[in-house]
């Protein structure tokens, strides 16, 4: 598939899509490695700090000098600033050297932001290719204010004028990597598109448990739910039952560049899937929140804290993963970066950093924070499903239907409620229907 993708990118822009757990991120990372091996300049951009980290890149807001702007009017005002003009001059020079721009998690990029990206690229006369990666059936862009815009009918990137200009070749991955159970995968694929019948309903209803069964589940199950407050309460309650001493690790935040505003730094730290204050105990069940291939832990991996070690000036957390592997975890440093041209290459400037252990308590997690994770033993609390694609994202974290449970306190008919919370944006359905995928 990598060869095919590279051949298409030689001539066309590409939209790489597919459901959850089909290997989009893996293929993207392989492509980046291949380009770098060939000494081709490819830049990986994420819609958030976490997605940027996962593909070894920077955020698209940082790279394209978008600041906090969410529409062209605000961007035009920002661009009149002298410091901004200097940044844009550097960006223009950098774009002349880049052969491929990759934008990950495109479903989280709004039409307005994508239009601003188009504005930047057109002004810079960018001649390279663009690869956008993601699944519009998953979580949509976060829109702070539902205000009147040019894209009022739909907030997705595919509704922007720039999307049409790019004339993408569409590729869809469809071979499951997360689960080996084809019946489960096929049912997930159908509800992803909003299709529901009695057979599918019966399958998911058979996974339902009541409160007593929930309480009797082993602690190695992770509960996914829609609201932060419930997640925090569950994790706090489970942690308080452990009799070992409480240990708190505070994230170490450093501003390396004085140009970075405090609110910009706070926003960046908040978008990472780490805790500014991590409270743990020996014996606590944790989940890893990032991929670190070199150290053998991955986003969604779980384990139990065996010990907390203080050696000279270093601190380690000894964790036994569910598969029995022992990890001696060190704090991880995330960098806020910007790219700058240096001759025919580019250099990375560090603007800020935050250092923290990349774990959280695993008893409960919000659905939004679980995107991209594979979870072996999973309970989906479906009481507070409110967003398009949210139910599908929650259920598709599971690797095995035999260790997937569905919990709800709703007294109404399960089938009626399940159908009601299976929210799919009609614009997304229409988009996939009218486009051909290779």
Where are these regions (language model features)?
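Conserved ATP-binding/catalytic motifs of P-loop helicase motor domains
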Residues: 1-438
């Amino acid at each position: 598939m990598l060869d095919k993708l590279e051949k298409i990118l030689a001539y066309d822009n590409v939209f790489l899509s597919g459901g959850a757990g089909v290997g989009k991120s893996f293929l993207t990372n392989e492509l980046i490695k291949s380009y770098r091996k060939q000494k081709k300049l490819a830049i990986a951009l994420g819609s958030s700090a976490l997605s940027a980290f996962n593909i070894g890149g920077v955020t698209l807001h940082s790279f394209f000098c978008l600041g906090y702007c969410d529409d062209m009017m605000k961007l035009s005002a920002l661009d009149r600033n002298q410091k901004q003009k200097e940044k844009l001059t550097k960006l223009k020079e950098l774009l002349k050297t880049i052969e491929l721009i990759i934008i990950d998690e495109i479903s989280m990029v709004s039409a307005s932001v994508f239009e601003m990206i188009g504005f930047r690229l057109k002004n810079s006369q960018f001649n390279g290719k663009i690869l956008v990666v993601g699944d519009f059936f998953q979580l949509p862009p976060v829109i702070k204010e539902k205000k009147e815009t040019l894209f009022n009918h739909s907030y997705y990137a595919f509704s922007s004028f720039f999307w049409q200009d790019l004339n993408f070749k569409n590729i869809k991955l469809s071979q499951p990597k997360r689960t080996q159970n084809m019946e489960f995968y096929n049912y997930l694929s159908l509800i992803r598109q909003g299709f529901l019948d009695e057979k599918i309903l019966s399958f998911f209803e058979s996974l339902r448990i009541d409160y007593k069964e929930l309480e009797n589940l082993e602690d190695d199950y992770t509960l996914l739910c829609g609201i932060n407050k419930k997640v925090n309460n569950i994790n706090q309650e489970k942690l308080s039952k452990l009799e070992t001493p409480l240990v708190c690790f505070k994230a170490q935040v450093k501003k390396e560049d004085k140009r970075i505003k405090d609110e910009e730094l706070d926003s960046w730290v908040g978008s990472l899937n780490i805790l500014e204050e991590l409270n743990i105990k020996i014996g606590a069940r944790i989940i890893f929140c990032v991929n670190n291939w070199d150290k053998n832990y991955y986003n969604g991996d779980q384990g139990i804290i065996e010990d907390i070690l203080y050696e000279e000036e270093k601190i380690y957390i000894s964790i036994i993963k569910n598969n029995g592997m022992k990890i001696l975890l060190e704090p991880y440093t995330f960098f806020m970066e910007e790219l700058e041209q240096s001759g025919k290459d580019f250099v990375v400037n560090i603007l800020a950093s935050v250092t923290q252990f990349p774990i959280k308590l695993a008893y409960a997690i919000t659905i939004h924070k679980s995107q991209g994770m594979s979870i072996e033993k999973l309970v989906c609390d479906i009481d507070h499903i409110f967003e398009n694609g949210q139910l599908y994202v929650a259920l598709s974290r599971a690797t095995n239907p035999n260790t997937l449970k569905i919990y709800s306190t709703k007294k109404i008919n399960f089938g009626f409620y399940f159908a009601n919370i299976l929210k799919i944006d009609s614009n997304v359905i229409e988009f996939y229907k009218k486009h051909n995928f290779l």
